């Protein structure tokens, strides 16, 4: 369940007369409460495969998560995957899975960019209006420096997102760029959400104020599909192997 390695799905498939018999669990599966089919990755002696399976054939348990996003736990023990359900050709499963992961990271980074910008705007407005010692707190050097760091983080994420998006659209091999973007996205979300709450003081954690919702979503996107540390570890392995 705590697996961040795309090359080694924890769900395994054993060849049977009707296809493959699966064993394992998927956690944090998204929108299975409304989906008619689930895209499942699993590994066999022949490599990684992807299959579309009808959700009414699966054991799905809804999870009560802090962000209230509709995540589910998926028990795949004993599920039979027919060969007709497999969507990849032999030997191409891992390539397709990495492509899906790349799209997911690009989408996450795009959402993160919007969240960071909104947190920056809320912070700029609040520190311009909130007064202490008869002057806006945004005029204090420490406050303005931390807000400036939020802006720098936003620009860092924006630049790397544009670069990765261009490489993806051009069909380039961008595995390392995607890992780098995942690493940067998590770090930027972590730093800006904490900075925004810090500069807001007590209002930063008030559920009546919109910043709380952005910070909660930022934490979700920081750690979903692996955190920054796992992305950095995978990137360092690729660099060590000259990939």
Each model region followed by its residue ranges:
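Alpha-helical interface subdomain recognition
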Residues: 15-20, 102-243
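A gly/ser-rich beta-alpha-beta helix-loop segment of oxidoreductase catalytic cores
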Residues: 1-15
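Short, surface-exposed charged micro-motifs
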Residues: 10-12, 19, 28
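Residue-level signal for inorganic ion chemistry
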Residues: 40, 51, 74-76, 116, ...
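Helix-biased detector of long, well-ordered alpha-helical tracts
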Residues: 75, 94-107
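Flexible, small-/acidic-enriched active-site or ligand-binding loops
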Residues: 28-29, 54-89
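A short core secondary-structure module
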Residues: 25-58
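Short beta-strand micro-motifs in enzyme catalytic cores
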Residues: 20, 38, 49, 70-74
């Amino acid at each position: 369940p705590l697996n961040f390695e795309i090359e080694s799905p924890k769900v395994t498939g054993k060849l049977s007369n009707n296809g493959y018999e699966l064993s394992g669990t998927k956690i944090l599966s998204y929108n299975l409460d409304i989906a008619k089919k689930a895209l499942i990755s699993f590994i066999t002696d022949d490599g990684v495969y992807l299959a579309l399976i009808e959700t009414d054939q699966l054991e799905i348990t809804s999870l009560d998560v802090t962000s209230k996003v509709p995540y589910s736990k998926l028990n795949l023990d004993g599920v039979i995957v027919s060969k007709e359900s497999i969507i990849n050709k032999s030997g191409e499963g891992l390539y397709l899975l990495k492509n899906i992961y790349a799209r997911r990271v690009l989408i996450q980074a795009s959402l993160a960019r919007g969240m960071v910008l909104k947190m920056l705007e809320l912070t700029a407005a609040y520190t311009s209006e909130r007064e202490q010692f008869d002057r806006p707190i945004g005029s204090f050097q420490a406050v303005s420096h931390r807000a400036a760091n939020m802006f720098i983080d936003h620009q860092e994420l924006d630049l790397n997102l544009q670069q990765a998006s261009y490489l993806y659209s051009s069909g380039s091999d961008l595995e390392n760029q995607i890992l780098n973007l995942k690493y940067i996205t998590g770090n930027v979300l972590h730093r800006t959400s904490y900075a925004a709450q810090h500069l807001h003081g007590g209002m930063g954690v008030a559920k009546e104020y919109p910043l709380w919702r952005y910070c909660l979503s930022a934490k979700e996107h920081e750690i979903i599909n692996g955190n920054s540390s796992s992305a950095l570890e995978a990137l360092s392995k690729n660099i060590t192997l000259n990939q």
